[in-house]
Amino acid sequence: MSRDIIKLDQIDVTFHQKKRTITAVKDVTIHIQEGDIYGIVGYSGAGKSTLVRVINLLQKPSAGKITIDDDVIFDGKVTLTAEQLRRKRQDIGMIFQHFNLMSQKTAEENVAFALKHSGLSKEEKKAKVAKLLDLVGLADRAENYPSQLSGGQKQRVAIARALANDPKILISDESTSALDPKTTKQILALLQDLNQKLGLTVVLITHEMQIVKDIANRVAVMQDGHLIEEGSVLEIFSNPKQPLTQDFISTATGIDEAMVKIEKQEIVEHLSENSLLVQLKYAGASTDEPLLNELYKHYQVMANILYGNIEILDGTPVGELVVVLSGEKAALAGAQEAIRQAGVQLKVLKGVQ
């Protein structure tokens, strides 16, 4: 059974500016298991970057308790000496939107800089840097300067540098937001690969639910300093409860964009009185059921599929359909009940039930 490697309990972060008090994080509790890829999602100002900085005490909380790898590092106050905190921080790597590479140093020199106080010999450092650059796919770019690298390559150097001290945790704070979509996918694939190869726990800070959908297994949603929803990616995408979470997921799945086009179709604009426009959401075993065929077989209800999407989230198929159901009123009622009994979420978008 996995254990919690990061435990943030009842965290508050308050800033005092002149006569104003700003609460950036309010009473947030998050436990992250070892080996998780854990996404923290929210719009700008939600408090997600402030929250993640308390993990290594770059930001000290105003209240709460922080436990990292079974060591309490904060409980109302910092519980470690300066030297203990320095060593603990070596277990936590960080990458950011801006790569923060030293322009006058080569890729290998940038990575080696993180090993300055490692106690390794010159030969050991050189071997480790070579291994790290190979791990992130830059073995042939060791002697290149940042100006000779693309944005994605610069971020790979930053990742190699963050891994130099063999951390157990890697925090990614909007690390792909300055990259193009193709490069973003490559960096996310690299993070996923590192998670699997090294057993690395990855904490992703992002404002894009698509990124969470691509590689995370758990997600927390923040709004105005509060944690408003948390769970597995499968749970959250299958059944988002909060309006903000629903907005994020609609954007990530493309359903909002699809609905604009669907609503302009003649079959929808002039929906007949014996028809319903419905949205179906299903996950896991229910994706294997020939449900729409069964509706006609048992209820003589026809199904016209206008939109369909199926994705694999954390190893589980999750699907969404927009369908026009047509049939007699009693048959439509029976069909809706059968759909729900099959474990499929149904929402009537248009038509009289």
UniProtKB/Swiss-Prot annotation:
Keyword Kinase carried by entry: no
Location in the cell reads: Cell membrane
Q: Which N-terminal stretch is annotated as signal sequence?
A: none
Spell out where the chain crosses the membrane: none
Q: Which GO terms describe its molecular function?
A: ABC-type D-methionine transporter activity; ATP binding; ATP hydrolysis activity
Catalytic activity reads: L-methionine(out) + ATP + H2O = L-methionine(in) + ADP + phosphate + H(+); D-methionine(out) + ATP + H2O = D-methionine(in) + ADP + phosphate + H(+)
Record's Gene Ontology CC terms? plasma membrane
EC number(s) per entry: 7.4.2.11
Keywords on record: Amino-acid transport, ATP-binding, Cell membrane, Membrane, Nucleotide-binding, Translocase, Transport
Taxonomically, the superkingdom here is Bacteria
Q: Where is the ABC transporter domain?
A: 8-249
Which positions in this protein are listed as binding ATP?
G42, Y43, S44, G45, A46, G47, K48, S49
Nucleotide-binding found in the keyword field? yes
Membrane topology field = Peripheral membrane protein
Its job = Part of the ABC transporter complex MetNIQ involved in methionine import. Responsible for energy coupling to the transport system.
| Oligomer status and interactors | The complex is composed of two ATP-binding proteins (MetN), two transmembrane proteins (MetI) and a solute-binding protein (MetQ).
Q: What family does this belong to?
A: Belongs to the ABC transporter superfamily. Methionine importer (TC 3.A.1.24) family.
Please identify the protein, giving its name as recorded.
Methionine import ATP-binding protein MetN
Q: Which organism is it from?
A: Streptococcus pneumoniae (strain ATCC BAA-255 / R6)
- Gene transcribed to yield this protein: metN
